Every structure is written in C-alpha cells, then in structure tokens.
C-alpha cells in the first residue's frame, strides 16, 4: 500500500452505486444480523442491507468514521477488528471490505485481506452469506480458505471508475454446513481469478443470481482492547504530564524595548568595521 493509503488506514469505501448492485442479489424474509468489520462511516453496509430488516453492527478503527457510523444508527465499536470478539456463527451476513495491504514485519507477511477473513469468517452461520469486496488478486490469496468454508461462490467485476482503479471485485459465498467444511473444492478456479479479470461478469441489476439470507438475532461485538482515545485524553490531563511539560517545554521569553542604536546606523557601523578590517 502507498503511504497515502496507510494514512487513511487502508480505507477504500465502496461506491454507493456498487452497494446497491450488491443489494439486488440479496434476499431476506425475516430480520437478521449483519456485521461489517471495517465499517467506515457505515454508508456501504446501510446501502447493501437497505429495507431488508437487518440488525447492523460494525467495527471501525478511525474515531471520526466510527462516530459517523454510530450516528446513523449502527451499533459500532471503535477499535481494531483483531481485538474484537464475536461468538461463532452469530451473523447471517458478513460484509467485508478489508484494508488492501500487507503486514509490516520482518518475514512471512500475510495480506490483510486474508488476515481479516481468517478472523471473521467464523462469525457467519451455516448458509449465511459472505460479501467480500477486494482487489482481484486477493481472491487467489484467500482461495483455499474461501473454498473450504463457503459454497455457491460467485465473483463479479465492479465497474465504477474508483472500483476499476483498484481492480475491485465482489465475491458472494454461502457458508457451508458444518459437515461439509474443510475441503477446498473449487480453490483452483478462484486462484485464476486475477488472470481473467476481464472475463468476469460485471455486477449489475440484471444479474440473476440470488442469495437468501437466513434469519438471526442481533449480534454482539465485544471489544477486548484498550480504549486508546480515552487513555490519550486522560494522559493530557494527568499531573505527571503537567509536571513533565514544565521541564520539557521551555516558555518563550518576550523581549521588549528600543534597540540600543537606530537600526540604519547599526548597519552603517558594521559596514565601516568590515572595510577597516579588509
């Protein structure tokens, strides 16, 4: 990821038009739980689930975006998804548009798309639906896990200019029943997605595929990490910080009064001394 992408925490929001196209493939008959582990300001999840009776929940690392999502009525946890816990097989719809980046370590760095999928796929109930928005090469990176845990997998190309810019595709999958999980059937086909991007169908309202979302109760996300913003605010108000400021931060002294000699005469004197020295 480029530095500009890292500065915005890998945030590449899905265009609203594409979220509405995704919505056209989803069918629900009763209220259900939907989770977005990288919810941003909440727009994508709201548009994807509009008028379906979904109970929305999400996680967002950026404080401002988390507040924006919460203001839209989404149950939002401010923090890292890796420090959040959700009971296994809790939600019927997992909408996942993770950061497009790699781990920053000395060796064996995984793609973030795979890390997020590994952490979150267990939240989906049997026959629940995964909506996975990623760059096309990431489908190959996640192929074995996807094929082992999901069936009825379909991949579509996105056509919005911003989506084309990042080679984005959307993958739909249905969580396998427990006794069918483990065998990565169809992984080879997913591995080839990155090499045949132009052959994929474009996601539009005309696509005939439909994914039925089973009912479920509202999901609960538990944050197990530290409240970093609250800690930072408390630190600024602490006695220790006030004492440290007195030692580390020097007060600037203001100098007032008239110069000893008028400025233009000082200049003349300096020039004269330089001439005499030469």
What are these regions (language model features)?
Residues 73-81:
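Conserved SAM-binding strand-loop segment of SAM-dependent methyltransferases
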Residues 85-93:
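A short acidic, Gly/Pro-enriched loop at the edge of an enzyme's catalytic core
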Residues 1-32, 43-46, 267-269:
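S-adenosyl-L-methionine
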Residues 165-249:
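Flexible, glycine-/basic-rich loop-and-beta segments that form/coincide
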Residues 40:
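Conserved glycine-rich SAM-binding loop
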Residues 69-70:
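Conserved SAM-binding loop
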Residues 103-174:
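Conserved Class I SAM-dependent methyltransferase catalytic core
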Residues 55-60:
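Conserved SAM-binding motif I beta-strand of class I
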